[in-house]
């Protein structure tokens, strides 16, 4: 189930604002080996909600445009067997399941319009939010601890739910 609400408003001539909110309730049936039964639960790595607020200003001659977007990404359930990285505060637990917490992002763009083309300068993830240890596995001790051994039995690069670059 999904639902979305959006509102647009012109504050002043050339200055607009948009706010949107999306709620997602996606379930899946899976077998719980601990309880020895089938259960209906949240689909893994699916954000429960996303909110966006965008403000945009275009100059009177329409030669420049400035955009700023704040984005709020909701929590989502992690797959079964996921182990919270040591020292991480980016996760919480509900009803025995691990969820990643919500996180904000800020994006900006400046656009210069010419007669038949345009050029822009943009920035993403200006809040510098990054997922802790996005690649799961044993760390290589011989090298920098940031490196994960791709040959380790628990290596998993599919648990990405947030930006990994600032």
Which role does the model predict for each range below?
Residues 1, 45-51, 102-106, 115, ...:
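Residues that define the transmembrane beta-barrel architecture of outer-membrane proteins
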Residues 1-81:
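Gram-negative outer-membrane beta-barrel transporters
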Residues 2-4, 34-43, 92-97, 107, ...:
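Extracellular loop and loop/strand-boundary signature of outer-membrane beta-barrel proteins
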Residues 7-8, 110-114:
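Alpha-helix C-terminal capping segments
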Residues 30-42, 82-92, 135-145:
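Flexible, surface-exposed loop regions and adjacent strand-edge segments
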Residues 69, 80, 84-85, 91-98, ...:
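Extracytoplasmic gating/loop element in the C-terminal half of outer-membrane beta-barrel translocons
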Residues 72-83, 112-166:
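C-terminal beta-signal and adjacent terminal beta-strands/loops
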């Amino acid at each position: 189930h999904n639902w979305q609400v959006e509102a647009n408003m012109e504050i002043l001539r050339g200055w607009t604002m948009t706010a949107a909110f999306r709620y997602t309730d996606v379930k899946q049936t899976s077998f719980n080996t601990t309880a020895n039964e089938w259960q209906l639960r949240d689909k893994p790595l699916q954000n429960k909600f996303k909110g966006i607020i965008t403000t945009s200003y275009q100059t009177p001659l329409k030669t420049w445009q400035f955009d700023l977007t704040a984005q709020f990404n909701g929590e989502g359930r992690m797959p079964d067997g996921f182990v919270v990285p040591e020292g991480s505060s980016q996760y919480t637990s509900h009803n025995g399941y691990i969820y990643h917490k919500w996180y904000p992002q800020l994006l900006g763009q400046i656009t210069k319009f010419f007669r038949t083309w345009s050029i822009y300068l943009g920035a993403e993830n200006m809040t510098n939010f990054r997922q802790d240890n996005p690649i799961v596995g044993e760390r290589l001790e011989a090298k920098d601890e940031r490196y994960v051994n791709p040959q380790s039995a628990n290596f998993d690069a599919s648990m990405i739910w947030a930006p990994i670059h600032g």
